[in-house]
UniProtKB/Swiss-Prot annotation:
Subcellular location: Cytoplasm
Source domain of life: Bacteria
The organism of origin for this protein: Agrobacterium fabrum (strain C58 / ATCC 33970) (Agrobacterium tumefaciens (strain C58))
Primary location recorded for the protein, binned into one broad class: cytoplasm
Identification of the protein by name: Thymidylate synthase
Pathway where it operates: Pyrimidine metabolism; dTTP biosynthesis
Cellular compartments per GO CC: cytosol
One function term, GO molecular function aspect: thymidylate synthase activity
Quaternary structure and partners: Homodimer.
Residue sites binding (6R)-5,10-methylene-5,6,7,8-tetrahydrofolate per the record: H51, D169, A263
Gene: thyA
Length: 264
């Protein structure tokens, strides 16, 4: 995807070298936006192969409101292992905030269910927002939300999504985030009876870790291939009814994977 390679190049060429929480060091810019027209194909990287199984299972795990890595481990997904405690718990991370945001009066708010209902009954609303950033609980989370708020927008029978990501690990994390929220947009569009529109990805602190510079330079030498097509099982009409087997990625051709260490 040209949009992603442009981001890599922009940060490598114009970014500021800074320290960070992990002690690794980064090169970063503040504020960057990419736009993907989902009618042109599914935005998954072709300049390195991604582990799509991890992306799908993580999204289903979020939507289930789960915050323990047991489901992920059972399905061969290890991306959260570094942050879990000895029992596999992560604290009130994404799934808890999406599906069970605690209200002051003791209620728990299912933001995703409310979102789906609002998209069906009041599509022109400007309040189709889900937030994972709960200041009262951030300190209890194993990792505070990086992709922390998203909003849907309906126009001309199409559903678009914009994500705000406060902290963006460009080499390892952002490719997953693009594919994950593009997939979420396809899923939500199907269950509310709309066509997919755009996925807009807005980044706050957009950074490349110092120990990813060599890998980023390698990736920038590669030429993007045609985007694949993501097929969803058309019989699924409930967002919480999707299973891993309901997704098929067709015509995905990608260059070899590029290994890089994760900063914890």
């Amino acid at each position: 995807m040209k949009q992603y390679l442009d981001l890599l190049r922009h940060v490598m060429e114009t970014g500021s070298d800074r320290g960070d929480r992990t002690g690794t060091g980064t090169r970063s810019v503040f504020g960057y936006q990419m736009r993907f027209d989902l009618s042109e194909g599914f935005p998954v990287l072709t300049t390195k192969k991604l582990h799509l199984r991890s992306i799908i299972h993580e999204l289903l795990w979020f939507l289930n409101g789960d915050t323990n890595i047991a489901y992920l481990k059972e399905n061969g997904v290890s991306i959260w292992d570094e942050w879990a405690d000895e029992n596999g718990d992560l604290g009130p991370v994404y799934g808890a905030q999406w599906r069970s945001w605690p209200a002051p009066d003791g209620r728990h708010i299912d933001q995703i269910a409310l979102l789906i209902e609002a998209l069906k009954t009041n599509p022109n609303s400007r309040r189709h927002i889900v937030s994972a950033w709960n200041p009262a609980l951030v300190d209890e989370m194993a990792l505070p939300p990086c992709h922390c708020l998203f909003q849907f927008y309906v126009s001309d029978g199409k559903l678009s999504c914009q994500l705000y990501q406060r902290s963006a690990d460009i080499f390892l994390g952002v490719p997953f985030n693009i594919a994950s929220y593009a997939l979420l947009t396809l899923m939500v569009a199907q269950v509310v009876g709309l066509k997919p529109g755009d996925f807009v990805h807005t980044l706050g602190d957009a950074h490349i870790y110092a120990n990813h510079f060599e890998q980023a330079q390698l990736q920038m030498t590669r030429t993007p291939k045609a985007l694949p097509t993501m097929r969803l099982n058309p019989d699924v009409k409930n967002l919480f009814g999707f299973k891993f087997e309901d997704f098929t990625l067709e015509n995905y051709e990608a260059d070899s994977s590029i290994k890089a260490p994760i900063a914890v």
